[in-house]
Amino acid sequence: MHYIQQPQTIEANSFTIISDIIRETRPDYRFASPLHEAIIKRVIHTTADFDWLDILWFSADALEQLCDALRHPCIIYTDTTMALSGINKRLLATFGGECRCYISDPRVVRAAQTQGITRSMAAVDIAIAEEEKNKLFVFGNAPTALFRLLEHNVTVSGVVGVPVGFVGAAESKEALTHSHFPAVAALGRKGGSNVAAAIVNALLYHLREA
């Protein structure tokens, strides 16, 4: 049985196919910048879903501010271990950054039980309370985490808000688009931890090549 086995070749061929399909099916589509293109194509590569051409929203200064945050030592807080696992932490570390996910932290479990809230909400509360200045929040699964962040009167370096689902997901992301945060958001129900990680990785790869 013959099939491609080299991961670099598989990825390169995938992106070629993605570019060809966009050119054939959306000949008038224009990306706002090379980084905008890289992010959307990486999300499509992750999901095999070309709807992302139209449903990934960026605040006016999101890409500039997210890149500025990532090129300095920062803390990325994720709502799931899946999102944390998908982020290229080795590359992030070259810029002095690290990832944290508190969803299973005993403090989070206790706070969620005591307050009658989701663990995702409690994890955001704990992350907000930490003293680090350069914070990024990356949400791919929990609308309640995104809602909780929006409830806090805080300044953060950026938000990737792409929780997936039918209850609160679209609403939480819509609220993000009206916030003051530098943000990338998925419009509608689609999203996921894999999408969240793909967006962060696209930003990191861009910085590596800059």
Curated annotation (Swiss-Prot):
Keyword Isomerase in record: yes
Gene3D superfamilies according to UniProt: Cobalamin biosynthesis CobH/CbiC, precorrin-8X methylmutase (3.40.50.10230)
Protein EC: 5.4.99.60
GO biological process: cobalamin biosynthetic process
Catalytic residue positions: 45 (proton donor/acceptor)
Catalytic activity, as annotated: Co-precorrin-8X = cob(II)yrinate
InterPro entries: Cbl_synth_CobH/CbiC, CobH/CbiC_sf
Family membership: Belongs to the CobH/CbiC family.
Function noted in UniProt: Catalyzes the conversion of cobalt-precorrin-8 to cobyrinate.
Protein name stated in the entry: Cobalt-precorrin-8 methylmutase
Species of provenance: Salmonella typhimurium (strain LT2 / SGSC1412 / ATCC 700720)
Gene this chain is encoded by: cbiC
